[in-house]
Amino acid sequence: MFVKSTIQFRWRAFDTYSAPPGARVDPRNAFFAGNGPVSDQKITNRSEREIVGWLTDTRPARELLLEELRLPADTYAQASITDPLIEKDRRQPPGDIDLIFVPDARRAIAIQVKRMRVIAETTHKDRTPGRQLGNITRLVEQANGSRAIGFCENYALVLIECYGPERAEYNFISRGPSPGVFRRIYHITKDQPIHNDVGLIFVEITQPTRSNVDQSGMVAVCMDKPAIPLDQSPGITARVRQLIAHRPSM
């Protein structure tokens, strides 16, 4: 039997215009028109660690993610954590926590991330460099492992980043991955043995123009499956207290 799935993203597009203090802004300057400064930096060339940091450093992305998780705007966040959350002699995944949100020390939300790079070569053709689509299994192992460690809520997050200037025929917000590429990623992910308690999030980050994505871009977030909260282990709560006491929030 064929079951059709419908998922819904919430998105935000952003564009910036820089001018020195006191300068008059030219009223003819058009936002979302791709006329900003050209950068040779592509979002698809950033490391996974860099792009996870981008999620929390970039206001539209951070706000969307916190809203989907139903968390306050001032929630503590940190990326790429090992000590003190992961025991040094641990031999099973995860080796680190890609992203953590802590609204309360007794409610730590651990998120494991797998990024997928998509390059729009033409209006209708995508390219996914490397053998990325086969790496979802590792993401699920890490997210299931976070649950085993004892965090309150655990998520697998599939992050799809797209470099889309070649889709200039489309409007600013429509230059992301093609529906066909996303369907493949979605169904491969849903076929994985993710634990019933572990949630699933999809995030799309698109660089629609040749301007740096820090200044101009689009981000979309879909909470496909909310995590089921668990009783957080006392040991993890103690480690989380140690983390938030000694490390600054992002």
Name the predicted role of every residue range.
Residues L99-F101, R107-T123, S146:
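Conserved catalytic cores of phosphodiester-cleaving nucleases, focusing on short active-site segments
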Residues F2-D96, V102-A105, R117, S249-M250:
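Acidic-basic catalytic patches of nuclease active cores, encompassing PD-(D/E)XK
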Residues P94-D96, R106-A108, E141, F151:
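Short connector loops at helix/strand junctions that flank enzyme active sites
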Residues D126-R127:
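Short, charged/polar, low-complexity loop and linker segments
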